[in-house]
Amino acid sequence: MNLPETIGEWALADFPVTYDRETIFDYINGAGEVYRSYAFKGVQVGRYQEAGGGELNVEVFDMGTTEDAYGVFSYAREEERRGIGAAFESRGSVLCFWQDRFYVCVAEEPGTDAPDSALEQMARGLSQGLPPGGERPALVDALPEEGLVPNSQRFFHTHQSLNYHYYLARENVLNLGTENDAVLARYRAGPSTLLLVDYREESKASEALTSFRDQITGGIEAAEPRSGAFVASRQEGSYLIVVLESASGEASEALLNSAATRLQTLRR
């Protein structure tokens, strides 16, 4: 996407700058790896001004796929609203949304006097210039619905991302990488934390299951290795189901069974 020269009363103040997978660190150093853990292609950055003195900074990330646009949106979101893009979140002076393969953020420049409606106006204008739609990853929709904590779903690929959301181990015991999909979510019952991973091949799921059980649960399906929190795992075709934290063996077993039933609709 090329940023439009004007959106409503807002006009580009500078020529937009584009960063790719290699130069992203010139723009956002520490957070660059978050985007690179997805199929990130590049980001276009622009600054808009309006006559009243308001100033907005715009970032349009091309995440490569609609699934990864959702993934980076889900990475740290606390709420999810409809009406801009596929979904959006507004926190203070920042509004972010995802749509098709794009993840977009609009931020008010500190110290400027932008109208209260400016963020949504700019976001809607940008949304109109993007391809419509956006489907959540099928793996996210395979999460059991009963007891799911709203907006707790995190879609990602790598071991580093898993440890950011839920620290499992220093080693990559689940053999996670950019070639697989993973989703993590919290549940009220227990409470519990559930991880689903799609390895795309049964043999790879089997290898990951063996590695996880050998290093975390002593080679068995379920155990209590973490200060009263039950951990359990099971393979369902090319998928791995892991209950990372639950208050009881019964709760972890129930969540395993529920997830297995949901995943059967996705079996390759």
Labelled PLM ranges:
Residues 1-268:
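Soluble, non-membrane globular domain cores that form compact, hydrophobic packing
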